[in-house]
Amino acid sequence: SAETAVYTPTEANLKARQEFRDSGLGIFIHWGIYSMFGQNEWYLNRGVNAQEYAKAASGFYPAGFNADQWVEAFKKAGARYVCFTTRHHDGFSMWNTSQSGYNIVDATPFGRDILRELSDACQKQDMRLHLYYSHLDWTRPDYPQGRTGHETGRDSTLANWPTYYKFMNAQLTELLTDYGPI
Protein backbone atom coordinates (compact mmCIF):
# COMPACT_ATOMS: atom_id res chain seq x y z
CA SER A 1 0.00 0.00 0.00
CA ALA A 2 1.18 3.50 -0.79
CA GLU A 3 1.86 5.82 2.10
CA THR A 4 0.42 9.29 2.11
CA ALA A 5 3.05 11.98 2.41
CA VAL A 6 2.55 14.40 5.27
CA TYR A 7 3.15 18.03 4.41
CA THR A 8 4.84 20.09 7.07
CA PRO A 9 5.18 23.78 6.17
CA THR A 10 8.45 25.52 6.86
CA GLU A 11 8.70 28.55 9.10
CA ALA A 12 9.24 30.74 6.01
CA ASN A 13 6.12 29.27 4.40
CA LEU A 14 4.01 29.95 7.48
CA LYS A 15 5.35 33.52 7.62
CA ALA A 16 4.52 34.07 3.93
CA ARG A 17 0.98 32.79 4.48
CA GLN A 18 0.47 35.20 7.36
CA GLU A 19 1.85 38.11 5.32
CA PHE A 20 -0.58 37.22 2.53
CA ARG A 21 -3.52 37.13 4.95
CA ASP A 22 -2.45 40.45 6.44
CA SER A 23 -2.20 42.05 2.98
CA GLY A 24 -5.91 42.52 2.56
CA LEU A 25 -6.88 43.73 -0.89
CA GLY A 26 -4.87 42.64 -3.90
CA ILE A 27 -5.39 43.02 -7.62
CA PHE A 28 -5.32 39.91 -9.83
CA ILE A 29 -4.81 40.70 -13.52
CA HIS A 30 -5.95 38.07 -16.03
CA TRP A 31 -4.99 39.59 -19.35
CA GLY A 32 -3.77 38.25 -22.67
CA ILE A 33 -4.74 37.53 -26.26
CA TYR A 34 -8.12 36.20 -25.13
CA SER A 35 -8.99 39.73 -23.99
CA MET A 36 -9.20 40.82 -27.62
CA PHE A 37 -12.11 38.44 -28.17
CA GLY A 38 -14.01 39.82 -25.19
CA GLN A 39 -13.61 36.40 -23.63
CA ASN A 40 -12.06 34.95 -20.54
CA GLU A 41 -8.78 33.06 -20.28
CA TRP A 42 -10.46 29.70 -21.09
CA TYR A 43 -11.58 30.87 -24.57
CA LEU A 44 -9.20 28.50 -26.36
CA ASN A 45 -10.88 25.53 -24.63
CA ARG A 46 -14.06 26.16 -26.62
CA GLY A 47 -13.00 24.33 -29.76
CA VAL A 48 -10.81 27.11 -31.14
CA ASN A 49 -7.87 25.91 -33.23
CA ALA A 50 -4.60 26.89 -31.52
CA GLN A 51 -2.86 27.89 -34.77
CA GLU A 52 -5.73 30.17 -35.74
CA TYR A 53 -5.87 31.61 -32.22
CA ALA A 54 -2.11 32.34 -32.26
CA LYS A 55 -2.58 34.60 -35.29
CA ALA A 56 -4.43 37.03 -33.03
CA ALA A 57 -1.12 37.92 -31.39
CA SER A 58 -0.30 39.97 -34.49
CA GLY A 59 -3.12 42.34 -33.50
CA PHE A 60 -2.46 42.52 -29.76
CA TYR A 61 -1.53 46.12 -29.06
CA PRO A 62 -2.52 47.38 -25.59
CA ALA A 63 -1.81 51.02 -26.42
CA GLY A 64 -3.32 52.32 -23.19
CA PHE A 65 -1.09 50.26 -20.92
CA ASN A 66 0.87 52.41 -18.50
CA ALA A 67 2.33 50.41 -15.62
CA ASP A 68 3.01 53.45 -13.43
CA GLN A 69 -0.58 54.66 -13.75
CA TRP A 70 -1.98 51.18 -13.12
CA VAL A 71 0.05 50.66 -9.95
CA GLU A 72 -0.85 54.15 -8.74
CA ALA A 73 -4.55 53.35 -9.26
CA PHE A 74 -4.18 50.02 -7.45
CA LYS A 75 -2.59 51.79 -4.48
CA LYS A 76 -5.32 54.45 -4.42
CA ALA A 77 -7.87 51.61 -4.29
CA GLY A 78 -6.12 50.25 -1.20
CA ALA A 79 -4.38 47.28 -2.80
CA ARG A 80 -1.19 46.03 -1.19
CA TYR A 81 -0.14 43.65 -3.96
CA VAL A 82 -0.79 42.82 -7.59
CA CYS A 83 -0.81 39.32 -9.06
CA PHE A 84 -0.14 39.26 -12.80
CA THR A 85 -0.94 36.39 -15.16
CA THR A 86 2.39 35.85 -16.91
CA ARG A 87 1.09 32.97 -19.01
CA HIS A 88 -2.26 31.24 -19.10
CA HIS A 89 -3.40 27.95 -20.66
CA ASP A 90 -3.17 29.48 -24.15
CA GLY A 91 0.63 29.40 -23.80
CA PHE A 92 1.12 33.08 -24.64
CA SER A 93 3.83 34.64 -22.48
CA MET A 94 3.26 38.22 -21.31
CA TRP A 95 7.00 38.83 -20.87
CA ASN A 96 10.13 38.71 -23.00
CA THR A 97 10.89 35.03 -22.58
CA SER A 98 13.87 33.53 -24.39
CA GLN A 99 12.15 30.12 -24.37
CA SER A 100 9.52 30.82 -27.02
CA GLY A 101 8.77 33.41 -29.67
CA TYR A 102 5.10 33.24 -28.67
CA ASN A 103 5.32 36.23 -26.34
CA ILE A 104 4.31 39.87 -26.00
CA VAL A 105 7.65 41.18 -27.32
CA ASP A 106 8.28 38.89 -30.29
CA ALA A 107 4.78 37.95 -31.49
CA THR A 108 2.97 41.29 -31.25
CA PRO A 109 3.41 44.74 -32.78
CA PHE A 110 3.39 46.11 -29.21
CA GLY A 111 6.91 44.76 -28.68
CA ARG A 112 7.21 45.80 -25.04
CA ASP A 113 7.86 43.66 -21.98
CA ILE A 114 4.73 44.37 -19.95
CA LEU A 115 5.98 42.35 -17.01
CA ARG A 116 9.25 44.33 -16.90
CA GLU A 117 7.30 47.58 -16.86
CA LEU A 118 4.90 46.32 -14.20
CA SER A 119 7.75 44.97 -12.06
CA ASP A 120 9.61 48.28 -12.29
CA ALA A 121 6.46 50.26 -11.41
CA CYS A 122 5.73 47.99 -8.44
CA GLN A 123 9.27 48.42 -7.13
CA LYS A 124 9.14 52.22 -7.53
CA GLN A 125 5.80 52.46 -5.75
CA ASP A 126 6.43 49.84 -3.06
CA MET A 127 3.77 47.43 -4.31
CA ARG A 128 4.36 43.70 -3.92
CA LEU A 129 4.26 41.73 -7.16
CA HIS A 130 3.00 38.16 -7.33
CA LEU A 131 3.07 36.09 -10.52
CA TYR A 132 0.61 33.53 -11.86
CA TYR A 133 1.97 30.96 -14.31
CA SER A 134 -0.21 28.23 -15.77
CA HIS A 135 1.31 24.77 -15.93
CA LEU A 136 -1.23 23.84 -18.60
CA ASP A 137 -0.44 24.66 -22.20
CA TRP A 138 -3.07 24.03 -24.86
CA THR A 139 -0.75 25.13 -27.68
CA ARG A 140 2.57 23.33 -27.19
CA PRO A 141 2.64 19.93 -28.86
CA ASP A 142 4.83 18.43 -26.11
CA TYR A 143 2.33 19.26 -23.36
CA PRO A 144 0.34 16.06 -22.68
CA GLN A 145 -3.41 16.50 -22.87
CA GLY A 146 -5.24 16.35 -19.60
CA ARG A 147 -8.93 16.95 -19.01
CA THR A 148 -9.00 20.22 -20.99
CA GLY A 149 -7.73 21.67 -24.25
CA HIS A 150 -8.63 18.67 -26.42
CA GLU A 151 -10.11 20.64 -29.31
CA THR A 152 -7.20 22.97 -30.06
CA GLY A 153 -5.80 20.89 -32.94
CA ARG A 154 -2.68 19.63 -31.16
CA ASP A 155 -1.32 16.21 -32.05
CA SER A 156 -1.57 14.27 -28.79
CA THR A 157 1.01 11.73 -30.00
CA LEU A 158 3.74 14.38 -29.61
CA ALA A 159 3.26 14.67 -25.84
CA ASN A 160 6.58 14.61 -24.02
CA TRP A 161 6.74 15.47 -20.33
CA PRO A 162 10.56 15.74 -20.14
CA THR A 163 10.76 18.39 -22.88
CA TYR A 164 7.77 20.26 -21.51
CA TYR A 165 9.21 20.27 -17.98
CA LYS A 166 12.51 21.59 -19.34
CA PHE A 167 10.67 24.41 -21.13
CA MET A 168 8.46 25.21 -18.13
CA ASN A 169 11.32 25.19 -15.64
CA ALA A 170 13.38 27.49 -17.86
CA GLN A 171 10.47 29.94 -18.04
CA LEU A 172 9.90 29.79 -14.29
CA THR A 173 13.61 30.44 -13.73
CA GLU A 174 13.36 33.57 -15.91
CA LEU A 175 10.36 34.82 -13.96
CA LEU A 176 11.89 34.19 -10.56
CA THR A 177 15.32 35.63 -11.34
CA ASP A 178 14.82 38.43 -13.90
CA TYR A 179 11.96 40.50 -12.49
CA GLY A 180 12.98 41.68 -9.05
CA PRO A 181 11.40 40.59 -5.78
CA ILE A 182 8.51 38.21 -6.39
What are these regions (language model features)?
Residues A2-I182:
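Mature catalytic domains of secreted/periplasmic carbohydrate-active enzymes
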